[in-house]
Amino acid sequence: MALHLTLARPYAKAAFADGQKANQLEAWLAVFTAFSKIIKNKEVARQIINPKFSDKEIKTLLFDLIQTIEPESTKQLKDKIDHFLQLLIDEKRLMILPDIALVYQQLLNKYQGIIEASVTYVFPLNDEHRQQIQKQLEKRFNAEVKLKMIKDESLLGGVIIRAGNWVMDGSIKGKLTRLAENLKG
């Protein structure tokens, strides 16, 4: 995964720079999000790696799919998408499109002053608790925060909140682990 992100970074940065210059940041995001979903489809992935299909056939398949899913963004970026796909095909890097989408989203969030935070929980949080967590994080980081909710039954109870390198582990599992370490120490 880390290697794929490293490989994806220059492609995402290039598209981001182009998106800034041409005022097409959101169009690129829509395209990358759609490509990510397309590439994660097992049937499409099988066709991409199947040597029976030529590079031209693969490019046509992907372009047709992206045009169907994101017609407006594809229309705006038609030539750029064509060039981008050809570059990825030539470099044998089509399978890192989901990673390019992830890095691009991170670049866009940073540019827009948005922080993504994940809240891992066992028992679902009500809207009031979600809003309270979001407000506290926005206050702490002085930025808009997008919450991603992740269910994990291994926590036993409580929550773990992650935002960038910052982690707040308020889970029962985390407390038990820390208690066991203290008793050993």
Curated annotation (Swiss-Prot):
SUPFAM superfamilies: N-terminal domain of the delta subunit of the F1F0-ATP synthase. Coiled coil: none annotated. It is a peripheral membrane protein. Pfam families: OSCP (PF00213). The keyword Transmembrane helix does not apply. The keyword Acetylation does not apply. GO terms for molecular function: proton-transporting ATP synthase activity, rotational mechanism. It is found in: Cell inner membrane. Keywords: ATP synthesis, Cell inner membrane, Cell membrane, CF(1), Hydrogen ion transport, Ion transport, Membrane, Transport. F-type ATPases have 2 components, F(1) - the catalytic core - and F(0) - the membrane proton channel. F(1) has five subunits: alpha(3), beta(3), gamma(1), delta(1), epsilon(1). F(0) has three main subunits: a(1), b(2) and c(10-14). The alpha and beta chains form an alternating ring which encloses part of the gamma chain. F(1) is attached to F(0) by a central stalk formed by the gamma and epsilon chains, while a peripheral stalk is formed by the delta and b chains. HAMAP family: ATP_synth_delta_bact (MF_01416). F(1)F(0) ATP synthase produces ATP from ADP in the presence of a proton or sodium gradient. F-type ATPases consist of two structural domains, F(1) containing the extramembraneous catalytic core and F(0) containing the membrane proton channel, linked together by a central stalk and a peripheral stalk. During catalysis, ATP synthesis in the catalytic domain of F(1) is coupled via a rotary mechanism of the central stalk subunits to proton translocation. This is ATP synthase subunit delta. It comes from Coxiella burnetii (strain RSA 493 / Nine Mile phase I).
